[in-house]
Amino acid sequence: MTISLGFVIAEFNRDLTYQMELLGREHAEFLGATVKETILVPGVFDMPLAIKKLCQREDIDAVVTIGSVIEGETDHDQVVMQHAARKIMDLSLEFNKPVTLGIPGPGMTRMAAHERVDYAKRAVEAAVKLVRRL
């Protein structure tokens, strides 16, 4: 059985999320999975509706989120990441479908974010493992 993935990718910090997208696609292919649909959203905070749309589809086995939340002048990164992570988990449970977190942050610098682009690979691997095991 070929595993079909949906990607939800934040456009904010696109220099980072583009690298992450490429790594995620490459790793999906390596694992024998297919990226069936990709939805770009403005930022991590905007992901839940796109995730929900993909979770509703019968032809998508799991959803992979890709984003990067970088520390700013305020605690905004903390708020964004906490709410996004919670909603991602809620949607996974609501639809009984793996939704994995490929979003490093919060509290990291741009340099640290560059060092963590491999989170996309981790999220793809987690999605594939969960589909196979559940």
Curated annotation (Swiss-Prot):
Source species: Methanosarcina acetivorans (strain ATCC 35395 / DSM 2834 / JCM 12185 / C2A)
Function of the molecule: Catalyzes the formation of 6,7-dimethyl-8-ribityllumazine by condensation of 5-amino-6-(D-ribitylamino)uracil with 3,4-dihydroxy-2-butanone 4-phosphate. This is the penultimate step in the biosynthesis of riboflavin.
Domain of life: Archaea
Active site: H76 (proton donor)
Residues at which 5-amino-6-(D-ribitylamino)uracil binds: F12, V44, F45, D46, S68, V69, I70, L101
Listed name of the protein: 6,7-dimethyl-8-ribityllumazine synthase
InterPro entries: LS (IPR034964), LS/RS (IPR002180), LS/RS_sf (IPR036467)
PANTHER family in UniProt: 6,7-DIMETHYL-8-RIBITYLLUMAZINE SYNTHASE (PTHR21058:SF0), 6,7-DIMETHYL-8-RIBITYLLUMAZINE SYNTHASE DMRL SYNTHASE LUMAZINE SYNTHASE (PTHR21058)
Upper lineage: Archaea, Methanobacteriati, Methanobacteriota, Stenosarchaea group, Methanomicrobia
Recorded name of the encoding gene: ribH
